[in-house]
């Protein structure tokens, strides 16, 4: 679930960015994927409220509800309005995150087409190949932007994408943001302990 509220897991990222512990790098593909999910979620919210209104009106009349102070029209949300409000929350979060956003100029289409026909990750033989193209683009962006020498943390729970990023020991994968946060906190604690011993 996407949650950009003050105490959410995602908002902790902003704290780590502001303290200089991490720098966020996102593929423009990831940004577009998040926007797509936000739009879909806002549509689902509006549909759920409309459904709730419909169910309530099966139980009692609109007139009775109005007499007791329940305004069922409040449940008729404007889909476009709430999509835009939801996207505004995302844009504000992104602004506070201040990420480097990798664009498509880093992508080498020849490499991706070769990987596709050679069935190299993320194009593994048992999966629907067409759906793996976004992962291939993201992995290609990571390889082009960071190479194999720069140490980077990648939050990803997709084995095909992990393999496609290459086998660099400097690419450290975490399945969740929580795992990344724990690693940062452990490293920070170890650093403080070493510093205190000196």
Which residues fall in each region the model found?
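Active-site-proximal, substrate-binding regions of enzyme catalytic domains
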Residues: 2-151, 159-198
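Conserved nucleotidyltransferase catalytic core and NTase-mimicking acidic/glycine-rich helix/loop elements
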Residues: 154
